[in-house]
Regions:
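Bacterial N-terminal signal peptides that target proteins for export
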Residues: 1-7
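Basic/polar N-terminal segments that are highly enriched at the extreme N-terminus
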Residues: 19-32, 195-209
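N-terminal helix-rich structural modules
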Residues: 21-142
Length: 209
């Protein structure tokens, strides 16, 4: 894996020609459009009650996700992980969002996770978004997540999907810039509670504060 790709390397060296600058501007505009499509479809889903119309919106969203995935992975392959300094926050975030929503292809998520890790090391991607993609990859491969960002639903009620070492999850979240899990889960209409330490229960005995 290369540290930099041809187009971004030219810009980093400060010798960007007019054609290179034009190419970057086009990529920025395209990624901003992809960002809009990704978020618009998800907002549209929330406007429908369960039924045929909602199913149709979801089907359209999944199709758009696949189109976005093909284009974004092609951009990363040819130009690298474009940082905010090159294309702005919205276009940069589009790279993450499209991979995060590529659940139909967990193999693609896992492959580009490595590219995003390198981008974080280079300051071209954000650590908290990497953490969310890491969780997505773990869950989609049937493994417990690390940061607790993935929420499931059972009988209409939300819950945090299984994760490693729950007692220290907020320590891990703080390292990558994520808010405490209790606050995060409030967005989904519930509040996660840290597990009670088993040794404390045994020491105090049942029914004691």
């Amino acid at each position: 894996m290369r540290l930099h790709h041809p187009l971004t390397l030219v810009l980093l060296l400060g010798g960007a020609s007019a054609p290179a600058q034009d190419a970057m501007a086009r990529l920025r505009a395209e990624l901003e459009r992809i960002h809009t499509l990704d978020q618009r479809d998800r907002q549209n889903v929330h406007g429908y009650a369960p039924g045929a119309q909602r199913d149709s919106v979801i089907a359209h969203m999944m199709h758009q996700d696949s189109v976005n995935r093909v284009r974004v992975t092609a951009i990363i392959d040819s130009a690298g992980w474009l940082g905010e300094a090159e294309v702005g926050r919205t276009a940069n975030q589009a790279l993450f969002l499209v991979l995060q929503h590529a659940d139909a292809r967990p193999d693609v998520q896992a492959r580009y996770l490595e590219e995003m890790r390198l981008a974080v090391e280079q300051g071209r991607a954000r650590a908290h978004e990497l953490a969310m993609l890491e969780d997505r990859v773990e869950v989609n491969h049937g493994r417990p997540q690390i940061y607790g960002s993935q929420i499931g639903w059972t009988e209409g009620r939300p819950f945090v999907k299984p994760m490693i070492d729950e007692e220290r999850v907020n320590e891990r979240r703080a390292v990558v810039g994520l808010e405490p899990l209790e606050r995060y889960t409030e967005r989904f209409g519930f509040t996660w509670s840290p597990p009670v330490k088993q040794e404390r229960v045994l020491r105090l005995g049942p029914g004691k504060p």
